[in-house]
């Protein structure tokens, strides 16, 4: 009975290791050793960021369901994207912990528009594209701060085609600094099962609530993680383990 129990326990342990959480993609906006994009300040801020770790892309160029964020040819007047100093918050593994220089992506209010008191980037969205093939239970975490006149709300939505979207989470109460422990500085959201095993998955972030041209949200150290979906054979082995344990009692 003891041997059977040990066998069952060992088998379950092996199977559990096959469905443990794993990294899909990470953006620290600095590391280039694995082919990722290093963030530049305006007017050279990129509109496409290849993940610094794992596999995925972040779009701010009007493709894949994203908005085309404005950036001037010279200077920073009315820019809607920029780069600023970052944080170590939510940086794990090989992610960069350098916080000086250009380390955090900023979405900025942009030019004043009609009606009075509104700004160009309000209502615009950036989109992450990645694969959930063989994966389930997506979790997204990141560090975020806002300036006093920066965006007050980030609406997260998900899609499997980049056209039809479902709500995932609404982030409010964004802190005015990256200081650890501040409400919503590190925001973690679990996404509904709609992306489970999707060959192509999209996460869209829409920004609203900016009240000045330079008000912004600064974001750093995005992590996309998920669980491996057990293969049919692994599920069958779980049943075998349970049956063995019952018969030996």
Region locations from a protein language model:
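Terminal, low-complexity interaction segments
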Residues: 26-40, 51-52, 147-151, 165-228
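Short, threonine-centered small-residue motifs that mark membrane-proximal processing/anchoring sites
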Residues: 2-8, 12-23, 222-243
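Extended extracellular/luminal ectodomain segments enriched in beta-structured repeat modules
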Residues: 132-141, 198
């Amino acid at each position: 009975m003891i041997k059977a129990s040990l066998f069952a326990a060992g088998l379950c342990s092996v199977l559990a290791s096959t469905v443990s959480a794993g990294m899909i993609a990470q953006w620290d906006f600095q590391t280039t050793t694995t082919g990722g994009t290093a963030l530049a300040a305006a007017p050279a801020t990129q509109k496409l960021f290849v993940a610094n770790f794992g596999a995925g892309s972040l779009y701010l160029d009007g493709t894949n369901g994203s908005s085309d964020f404005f950036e001037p040819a010279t200077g920073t007047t009315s820019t809607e994207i920029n780069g600023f100093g970052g944080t170590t918050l939510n940086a794990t593994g090989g992610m960069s912990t350098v916080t000086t220089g250009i380390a955090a992506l900023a979405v900025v209010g942009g030019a004043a528009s009609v009606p009075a008191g509104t700004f160009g980037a309000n209502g615009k969205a950036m989109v992450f594209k990645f694969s959930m093939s063989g994966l389930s239970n997506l979790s997204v975490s990141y560090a975020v701060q806002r300036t006093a006149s920066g965006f007050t709300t980030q609406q997260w939505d998900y899609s499997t085609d980049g056209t039809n979207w479902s709500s995932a989470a609404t982030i409010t109460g964004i802190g005015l600094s990256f200081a650890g422990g501040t409400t919503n500085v590190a925001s973690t959201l679990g996404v509904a099962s709609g992306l489970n095993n999707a060959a192509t998955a999209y996460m869209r972030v829409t920004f609203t609530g900016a009240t000045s041209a330079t008000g912004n949200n600064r974001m750093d150290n995005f992590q996309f993680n998920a669980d491996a979906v057990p293969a049919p054979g692994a599920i069958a082995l779980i049943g075998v383990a349970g049956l063995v344990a019952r018969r030996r009692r």
